[in-house]
Amino acid sequence: MVYDENCSYCAEGALLDAFGIKIGELPMSKVILFKEQSHRGRVIVACKRHVDDITDLTKEERIQFMEDVSHVAEILHELFHPDKINFGAYGDTMHHLHFHLVRDV
């Protein structure tokens, strides 16, 4: 796995603690509960491998990563019964592939 010691998602520890709490791991990703919970259940699904873009993954990795994202969305639906889950993949400040999953209010 590619690793960047300066990346919050790779290094975890104090870098990650600033904004989130790691709550689980899936085959291709880490699941992080976002500390700012203006939308209850807001989580981040971050790729275990340090890549900037989904196109940097192999086809098999891409399929598994999206399976992980879908699995987390299913759990959010079970827990919160939202009308919709919003998926955000900005990549503007964190150059590590991750999705924000935010339920509607």
Language-model features, listed with the residues they occupy:
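HIT superfamily nucleotide-processing domains
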Residues: 1-105
